[in-house]
Regions:
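Solvent-exposed loop/turn segments connecting transmembrane beta-strands
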Residues: 19-28, 50-62, 84-96, 116-127, ...
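Detector for outer-membrane/organellar transmembrane beta-barrel domains
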Residues: 91-155
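Hydrophobic, lipid-facing positions within transmembrane beta-strands of outer-membrane proteins
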Residues: 9, 28-32, 62-66, 96-100, ...
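Outer-membrane beta-barrel initiation region
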Residues: 1-57, 70
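Repeated loop/turn-to-beta-strand initiation elements of outer-membrane beta-barrel proteins
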Residues: 39-45, 74-79, 108-114, 137-142, ...
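Transmembrane beta-barrel strands of outer-membrane/channel proteins
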Residues: 15-18, 45-49, 80-84, 114-118, ...
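Outer-membrane beta-barrel "beta-signal"
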Residues: 171-176, 206-220
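Residue-level signature of outer-membrane beta-barrel architecture
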Residues: 36-38, 70, 104, 116-118, ...
Length: 220
């Protein structure tokens, strides 16, 4: 039974990594969340983004979200709030949106974060993230990870056509130096899909990417 009056919090960097791609690009990537509250009700802040080295461009914010969360079943929370994404450059036009998420652990201990966003123009997008920890020893884990993005409507202003837009699969090996600190290494593969892939090719870009990552998972 959840403890109604208990309040605590956590800051977790699930991914804080340096990436080297098959196009000889270097990236710094972060994926973090912070929360405060009890077992039933919490406030979350989530952020993901990347910065490509030596391209002269500011970091790209994939998402920054402030969410209210409610426990609706064992291991499952429903969340709702506000978010933004885009360049972090001063004065940059960012996409602001409402977000609704189903966040928790599926059977067989798959960690899920499924979200639906609606921006100021009414454009609807869906993002699915799943990861799973395979314990190799008391201190080491192998973690496969899957992420998919799709749009239910065309969002021309943000170069996001309707349909499935991208898929990303990764595999990381991490070793826990302590409960709070675990360095890791890994690889990933990502690919644009459907009309998004056609647009990337038309613009002279690569529709797929492979990368090697070195990073650390930590919380406090």
């Amino acid at each position: 039974e959840p403890i109604k009056s208990y309040r605590t919090g956590q800051v977790l960097f699930d991914r804080l990594e340096v990436t080297r791609t098959d196009n000889d690009e270097d990236l710094i990537v972060w994926d973090m969340l912070a929360w405060y509250g009890g077992d039933r009700n919490r406030i979350y802040f989530k952020s993901e983004g990347e910065n490509r080295s030596d391209d002269g461009e500011p970091a790209e914010l994939e998402s920054a979200e402030l969410l209210a969360s409610r426990l609706i079943a064992p291991f499952w929370e429903i969340q709702g709030g506000l978010g933004t994404r885009g360049s972090i450059a001063s004065g940059a036009e960012r996409e602001n949106y409402l977000v609704f998420s189903l966040f928790g652990m599926a059977p067989y201990r798959f960690e899920m974060d499924n979200s639906l966003t609606v921006n100021e123009d009414g454009d609807i997008a869906v993002n699915i993230e799943a990861e799973y920890d395979i314990r190799l020893s008391q201190l080491s884990y192998l973690q496969p990870r899957l992420e998919m993005g799709a749009a239910l409507t065309d969002a021309e202003e943000y170069d996001r056509p309707s349909g499935f837009n991208n898929v990303r699969m990764g595999l990381r090996y991490r070793y826990e130096l302590s409960r709070e600190l675990a360095p890791y290494i890994g690889v990933y593969w990502s690919r644009a899909l459907g009309d998004k892939a056609d647009r990337v090719r038309d613009q002279g870009g690569d529709e797929s990417e492979i990368g090697v990552v070195v990073g650390v998972r930590m919380w406090f």
